[in-house]
Design a protein with these regions (language model features):
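Positively charged, phosphate-engaging catalytic surfaces used for nucleic-acid and nucleotide handling
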Residues: 1-126
């Protein structure tokens, strides 16, 4: 490696749930997602991963709504795995999703998130 090789190596840091969620949301945005699609993506994946609503998940686990760090570790891990996989799939689809309206674009994004969530669910122990 030459003298400038260190500049080519990006800095590393521990990845956490917030970072994974940010990347997931960026992938939604990069595909043209807007309006309430971010909230709906959370609702969709929660339904597929846990079989309940977001409100039920937080209530039944004693978590504080809007704070995933208050959920049990297995739930946090499930969100992280799913959002990482869903972001990868959405990144693969950049430039291929479209429609006549924002609702159509959002629907395609949500369909992708739902499909990924169904696949992820098969690997979860519950």
């Amino acid at each position: 490696m030459s003298g400038n090789s260190q500049a080519l190596i990006p800095p590393r840091k521990r990845v956490d749930g917030a970072m994974v969620n940010c990347r997931f949301n960026k992938s939604i945005k990069d595909n043209g997602g807007a309006d309430d699609v971010y909230e709906q993506a959370a609702v969709t994946q929660t339904k597929e991963l846990f079989g309940c609503t977001v409100n039920d998940l937080y209530r039944e686990t004693g978590g504080k709504k809007g704070r995933r760090d208050t959920l049990p570790q297995p739930a946090q891990e499930a969100y992280m795995v799913n959002e990482s996989l869903a972001a990868n799939e959405l990144d693969r689809q950049i430039g291929t999703l479209g429609g006549e309206s924002q609702d159509e674009v959002n629907s395609q994004i949500l369909a992708s998130v739902e499909q990924t969530s169904k696949q992820t669910r098969k690997w979860l122990p519950w």
